[in-house]
């Protein structure tokens, strides 16, 4: 696998830097990098991996061209996504990751997809892009690569349920009253090292809700066949229950380099339509294995939807479909940012999201309606945030 040529979109973020760890360990060539505004880290990556093409945020394009001499520098991640590569790893966070995903799939690229918003907000549009251009998709999330591995060799008609595990976040065992939770407390995830947005989503269980929606879209099952189990040890990442009663599970250490490496291995033969699971030949080990026997106690419990209503809101949006997943994603991004900056409280996050969902207009999902609904939901969420903690505009 050392001859693999990668494009890494979102290279300076958490998944992006860990992808480059995998590339470094396995000797992959990195032909293209795309980042936002973290020019210092990007410059280090360019010096090490010597890509031919780099994309940056337009606001730093002139400075980047000056500092990254000898490299072609652009301000268009979608152009970067179609550069020659064996695998495109899209680690861009948020809706800005959708156009590059679409471009890569329409260009026939093999995409290892960490941008969960692509499948949460616009799944059928992404599958249309893959069908049009011959692109392939494999997810990067540990839970979804776990499901992918469990489904390998199985007929989708034999699948009764897909099960995703959740660590439960930093507040799974307390405090009883979450109203006074601070951003600093919420950012202390017990198992995983992630970016701030995903870490807060894990604390509210919204991350698991988004993963449930993504899972249903990836594997072509209704949300009623995608379950969640809280597993504090974060060893079992996913399981598949088959119609004969058998249960297959995937487990491993809480190290994102493993699912990233598997997604890179699997992407060239990845999915072109929901549930199109073909497996992969695996590369060399990139992290420490769990060892055997596996010592210690494993716990599994049902999630508390009263304490963590964001998970229930995600099921609601996913079951409704249409434009509600777009509104959910946009409202959550605004709410999490407001919480991190002290503008609203922890418990205001689900209240704000619910208000936006209640007010979301109906309509069919198209690229235009997605963009319009995203903008509307963000603006409405910002209005609700303006009332502040405990304001009538949020909780009413």
From Swiss-Prot:
Group of enzyme by EC: oxidoreductase
Which reaction equation describes what this protein catalyses?
2-C-methyl-D-erythritol 4-phosphate + NADP(+) = 1-deoxy-D-xylulose 5-phosphate + NADPH + H(+)
Biochemical pathway: Isoprenoid biosynthesis; isopentenyl diphosphate biosynthesis via DXP pathway; isopentenyl diphosphate from 1-deoxy-D-xylulose 5-phosphate: step 1/6
Pfam families documented for this protein: DXP_redisom_C, DXP_reductoisom, DXPR_C
Q: Which UniProt keywords apply?
A: Isoprene biosynthesis, Manganese, Metal-binding, NADP, Oxidoreductase
Q: Which InterPro entries match?
A: DXP_reductoisomerase (IPR003821), DXP_reductoisomerase_C (IPR013644), DXP_reductoisomerase_N (IPR013512), DXPR_C (IPR026877), DXPR_C_sf (IPR036169), NAD(P)-bd_dom_sf (IPR036291)
Where does the chain bind Mn(2+)?
141, 143, 211
For whether the record's keyword set contains Isomerase, the answer is no
Q: What is its EC number?
A: 1.1.1.267
Name a single GO biological process: isopentenyl diphosphate biosynthetic process, methylerythritol 4-phosphate pathway involved in terpenoid biosynthetic process
Query: What's the domain of life for this entry?
Result: Bacteria
Molecular function via GO: 1-deoxy-D-xylulose-5-phosphate reductoisomerase activity; manganese ion binding; NADPH binding
Give binding positions for NADPH: 12-15, 36-38, 117, 195
Residues at which 1-deoxy-D-xylulose 5-phosphate binds: 116, 142-143, 167, 189, 202, 207-208, 211
Q: SUPFAM superfamilies attached here? A: 1-deoxy-D-xylulose-5-phosphate reductoisomerase, C-terminal domain (SSF69055), Glyceraldehyde-3-phosphate dehydrogenase-like, C-terminal domain (SSF55347), NAD(P)-binding Rossmann-fold domains (SSF51735)
Q: Which cofactor does it need?
A: Mg(2+); Mn(2+)
Q: What does this protein do?
A: Catalyzes the NADPH-dependent rearrangement and reduction of 1-deoxy-D-xylulose-5-phosphate (DXP) to 2-C-methyl-D-erythritol 4-phosphate (MEP).
Question: NCBIfam families annotated for this entry?
Answer: Dxr
Q: Which family does it belong to?
A: Belongs to the DXR family.
Spell out the protein name for this chain.
Answer: 1-deoxy-D-xylulose 5-phosphate reductoisomerase
What is the primary gene name for this protein? dxr
């Amino acid at each position: 696998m050392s001859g693999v040529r990668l494009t890494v979109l979102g290279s300076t973020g958490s998944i992006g830097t860990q992808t480059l760890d995998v590339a470094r360990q396995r000797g992959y060539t990195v032909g293209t990098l795309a980042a936002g505004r973290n020019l210092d880290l990007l410059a280090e990556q360019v010096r090490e991996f010597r890509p031919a093409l780099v994309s940056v945020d337009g606001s730093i394009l002139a400075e980047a061209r000056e500092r990254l001499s000898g490299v072609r520098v652009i301000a268009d991640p979608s152009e970067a996504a179609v550069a020659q590569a064996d695998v495109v790893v899209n680690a861009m966070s948020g809706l800005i990751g959708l156009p590059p995903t679409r471009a890569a799939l329409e260009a026939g690229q093999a995409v290892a997809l960490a941008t969960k918003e692509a499948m949460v907000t616009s799944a059928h549009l992404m599958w249309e892009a893959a069908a049009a251009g011959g692109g392939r998709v494999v997810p990067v999330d540990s839970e979804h690569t776990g499901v992918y591995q469990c489904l390998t060799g199985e007929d989708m008609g034999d699948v009764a349920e897909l099960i995703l595990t959740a660590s439960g976040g930093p507040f799974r065992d307390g405090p009883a009253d979450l109203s006074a939770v601070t951003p600093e407390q919420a950012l202390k995830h017990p198992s995983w090292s992630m970016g701030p947005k995903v870490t807060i989503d894990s604390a509210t269980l919204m991350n698991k809700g988004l993963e449930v929606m993504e899972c249903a879209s990836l594997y072509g099952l209704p949300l009623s066949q995608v379950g969640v189990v809280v597993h504090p040890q974060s060893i079992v990442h996913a399981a598949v229950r088959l119609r004969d009663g058998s249960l297959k599970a995937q487990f491993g250490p809480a190290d994102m380099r493993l699912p990233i490496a598997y997604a890179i291995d699997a992407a060239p033969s990845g999915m072109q339509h929901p549930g199109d699971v073909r497996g992969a030949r695996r590369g060399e080990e990139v992290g420490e294995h769990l060892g055997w026997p596996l010592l210690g106690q494993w716990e599994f419990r049902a999630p508390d939807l009263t304490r963590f209503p964001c998970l229930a809101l995600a099921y609601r949006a996913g079951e409704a479909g249409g434009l509600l997943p777009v509104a959910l994603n946009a409202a959550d991004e605004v709410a999490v940012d407001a919480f991190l900056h002290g503008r609203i409280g922890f418990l205001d996050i689900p209240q704000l999201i619910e208000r936006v969902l209640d007010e979301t207009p109906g309509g069919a999902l198209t690229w235009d309606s997605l963009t319009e609904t995203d903008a509307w939901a963000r603006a409405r969420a910002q209005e609700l945030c303006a009332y502040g903690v405990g304001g009538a505009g949020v909780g009413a």
